[in-house]
């Protein structure tokens, strides 16, 4: 089962992601993230820091995703493991949609086409939603020069996340990221446990 944690920077998703490993330790989850720790992931981070060409940046994210699938996600899923990833395909669909606006006609359609036929869609996506000003206060990056951390960018990203939810409501669980972390952890953790147990029951019946 593949679970992804999504949200704008400062939403609390990384805090939740780190806490889910111990909370669900009895399920022995594979805890992972995008961008990864490979040289491709480092290239992605460098591209962000150095404001690389938006198309080049998007394709680096896709390359990192391909490596992540091959090295972590596919092997774990083939063993029926629970995989929990901090960021995944939805992050590209929203963040790169912002950076590619005005450069590529209909960036989201283009991004989906790039992934078509080889990616694996999540079984459950937990989206932490917080007001953009709250997220910026948490990260201490209000007015940051990094393009992904500017208020106008995060506002669009939040909007695009909600559009994805409307397109695939069954996959998403939206949680209020302003609630206490322990409450968010309990709700998210039990939702994952329920879905994982449900999928295992269905496999045993088939």
Curated annotation (Swiss-Prot):
<keyword id="KW-0545">Nucleotide biosynthesis</keyword>
<dbReference type="GO" id="GO:0006235">
    <property type="term" value="P:dTTP biosynthetic process"/>
</dbReference>
<keyword id="KW-0067">ATP-binding</keyword>
<comment type="similarity">
    <text>Belongs to the thymidylate kinase family.</text>
</comment>
<feature type="binding site">
    <location>
        <begin position="7"/>
        <end position="14"/>
    </location>
    <ligand>
        <name>ATP</name>
    </ligand>
</feature>
<dbReference type="Pfam" id="PF02223">
    <property type="entry name" value="Thymidylate_kin"/>
</dbReference>
<keyword id="KW-0547">Nucleotide-binding</keyword>
<dbReference type="GO" id="GO:0006227">
    <property type="term" value="P:dUDP biosynthetic process"/>
</dbReference>
<protein>
    <recommendedName>
        <fullName>Probable thymidylate kinase</fullName>
        <ecNumber>2.7.4.9</ecNumber>
    </recommendedName>
</protein>
<keyword id="KW-0418">Kinase</keyword>
<keyword id="KW-0808">Transferase</keyword>
<dbReference type="GO" id="GO:0004798">
    <property type="term" value="F:dTMP kinase activity"/>
</dbReference>
<dbReference type="InterPro" id="IPR018094">
    <property type="entry name" value="Thymidylate_kinase"/>
</dbReference>
<dbReference type="GO" id="GO:0006233">
    <property type="term" value="P:dTDP biosynthetic process"/>
</dbReference>
<dbReference type="GO" id="GO:0005737">
    <property type="term" value="C:cytoplasm"/>
</dbReference>
<dbReference type="InterPro" id="IPR027417">
    <property type="entry name" value="P-loop_NTPase"/>
</dbReference>
<dbReference type="GO" id="GO:0005524">
    <property type="term" value="F:ATP binding"/>
</dbReference>
<dbReference type="InterPro" id="IPR039430">
    <property type="entry name" value="Thymidylate_kin-like_dom"/>
</dbReference>
